Amino acid sequence: MGLFDKIFGSYSDREVKRITPIVDKIDSLGPEMEKLSDEELKQKTFEFKDRYAKGESLDDMLPEAFAVCREASTRVLGMKHYREQLIGGIVLHQGRIAEMKTGEGKTLVATLPVYLNAIAGKGVHVITVNDYLATRDKEWMGQLYEFLGLTTGVIVHGLTNDQRREAYNADITYGTNNEFGFDYLRDNMVIYKEERVQRPLHYCIVDEVDSILIDEARTPLIISGAGSKSTDLYKIADFFVKKLREEEDYTIDEKAHAAMLTDKGVAEAEKAFGIENYADANNMELQHHITQALKANYVMKRDKDYMVKDDEIAIVDEFTGRLMEGRRYSDGLHQAIEAKEGVKVQRESKTLATITFQNYFRMYTKLAGMTGTALTEETEFREIYGLDVVVIPTHRPVQRQDHSDLVFKTAKGKYDAIVEEIIETHKTGQPVLVGTTSIEKSEYLSSLLKKKGVPHKVLNARYHEQEAEIVSHAGELGNITIATNMAGRGTDIKLGEGVLEVGGLKIIGTERHESRRIDNQLRGRSGRQGDKGHSRFYISLEDDLMRIFGSEKLQSVVDRLGLEETEAIESKMVTKSIENAQKKVEGNNFDIRKTLLGYDDVMNKQREVIYKQRSQVLEGENLEDSVQAMIEDVITNAVQAHLGNIDEDDFEKELGDLIKYLEDIMLPHGKFTVEELKTNSNEEITRKFIECAREIYKEKEEFVGSEQMREIERVIILRVVDTKWMDHIDDMDHLKQGIGLRAYKQQDPIQAYQMEGSAMFDEMINNIKIDTVRYLFHVKVEAEKPQRERVAKETGASHGGDSQEIKKKPVKKEPKVGRNDLCPCGSGKKYKSCCGREVV
């Protein structure tokens, strides 16, 4: 703590002091609310809604609304909010993050701002980390909201569109971040506005906000369709890399979580695949497959990063140890792991729509969050999301004793000491919760305890179903529970009878996580609501964190001391060294997330433009003006591209090419000749073409009817926009993967990505106009209602991992470029004078 904080108190202390008068006001309204009957209390909700409609702000109503909610909670749930919980509720209403320790009643705290903001009638979303918690909280707290005259809904996997729409139309909606994000993407793929399920994003409270906004920030939500690529190359690449030797043919960079070929490895690849130059751009697809095969075989670890379950690869969440059902690694990594493990390699998918949680949650008008551990990531919350963190005081002082780390020379010595400690503690009856960082390590520790005949329960991704049940009993006398990281988060560990007398729940950490926050979460499982408890971490110099990021200074101290395998050191210097290693990793991860956000912001702005225009097409009753403007643009651009600034000698040739080009898109064949138009100015030619196109379009509309034509326009525009946008997502992803490999002198890669991405976006918009006009003029119309259809059948949704390998270039299915067309590279020159010079 700095000198300033010692004198004036921390930022959180000052904020809590500022909020206290509002809490006093809520307290003073208590007796008045107690006098109201149940019906009168319920009527208060309708009174608040009326006052809001007349212009009174939610801030002005806060003390009274919180007092109403508090009284209703006392009657319905038998729980009255503490003053500290009122402070937490105010912080959440203000659009901030409330850090509240485990067991302080976060679920109850959320009812206050949820009730107040539901009065606005625009919908309140409460985000939880899994379907179990979403359903539990909706049923539990839903009693309170329904007593107060509000409706609640829950979004879980497997609901129909009608069920989802009903849940979103409720005053308060519970659900997981994945479900909300996927619904947003799906809503922006519909052909008819009635198919949308979400309302505009208004107010959102994210439970376990650090887990969702930081731990999962780098993994985008992806809706995908089946790709067309063969899976054979994954098996061939896997066969090739399995024969390679570490250091000689490839190297592993543990910090970057990557593997790469050495010069000798490159020579082996050239020999094996019969190619001259591995680095050649023509071999990009092969490079991609080999890179992913290397990562799958030598970086990704079975039972730590993924599991083989029912002959499929299931991803393990590194932060919770849970299986991430239905998710697949993106960019071909999942297929590479399937090839490695000898299970069926599924086809690589094509991305239809994607968004990161960072950008999804930043779309809410007001965002708030709560967690037991946020302060260590305060800078990131502020810089990325504009959220500040306020630490809420605990209702009772924390009595848990956090002991210094014990550092061992080897992993074996560490595990032997842990087993010894568990056995000694078990003799007293004190319950023990042991936190591990992977399934593999939890099962290794379990096998050691079995050999000693110590009864215990294991909680990891393999036994996901019993998670809440096992966790809820972890605080009972004599129980020993081994848990992968934060599995069971969101379920309280209540102490059984007689446990306080033996010292409360003991927490043993088997190694430090690379994030201090995850360590704090493990510690926080003990000592809830002022209970006694103990915590200690056991560390070895062979642990991943110490091996990759630990200081050489610490290693030399241990060497000088000549520690035996079973001996440990315990000192402030050691703890400091470990914390510095963690800070180094946290800083590194923050930089990666910030860089990714820089790239994603470019894509996000483009997505906003496309989705906004798409929404206007969905809502628009009359698209005629937009279509007429497209026709004009296509003709004007074509005339300019063919006839602008050309030699007189080339004029007739270019005019002939122009007529053919526009005949292919919209003009009737043989209507215009070079002979007839060659004496006209460019402006006259443009006018004649536009008049002709309008006349044809008018005849088509008269035949089919205006209402029918608008319907056809809507469907075709949406189909073209979606198809081009999907291709653009692939192109932008390929650009992002390749841009860092270029030697940009004095130029920021993100800036280069922005400039080139902008040019590609403009080209896409132009191609949308051309294809829309072509389809509208070529579509065979009948005088009947067009069939409603989806643009792309969604075949899968995944929360794919990010990847830093080179992505193979997507094949763009576009019309052949004419020699006199504008060059697609975006230079503004004709194709024949630019990239077309090299084409024979």
UniProtKB/Swiss-Prot annotation:
Part of the Sec protein translocase complex. Interacts with the SecYEG preprotein conducting channel. Has a central role in coupling the hydrolysis of ATP to the transfer of proteins into and across the cell membrane, serving as an ATP-driven molecular motor driving the stepwise translocation of polypeptide chains across the membrane. It is an enzyme of class 7 (translocase). Monomer and homodimer. Part of the essential Sec protein translocation apparatus which comprises SecA, SecYEG and auxiliary proteins SecDF. Other proteins may also be involved. This is Protein translocase subunit SecA. One of its GO terms (cellular component) is cytosol. Belongs to the SecA family. Its cofactor is Zn(2+). GO terms for biological process: intracellular protein transmembrane transport; protein import; protein targeting; protein transport by the Sec complex. GO terms for molecular function: ATP binding; metal ion binding; protein-exporting ATPase activity. HAMAP family: SecA (MF_01382). Residues 787-821 are annotated as: Disordered. Its EC number is 7.4.2.8. It catalyses: ATP + H2O + cellular proteinSide 1 = ADP + phosphate + cellular proteinSide 2. Coiled coil: none annotated. May bind 1 zinc ion per subunit. Zn(2+) binds at C823, C825, C834, C835. It is a peripheral membrane protein. It is found in: Cell membrane; Cytoplasm. ATP binds at Q85, G103, E104, G105, K106, T107, D492. The keyword ATP-binding applies. Keywords: ATP-binding, Cell membrane, Cytoplasm, Membrane, Metal-binding, Nucleotide-binding, Protein transport, Translocase, Translocation, Transport, Zinc.
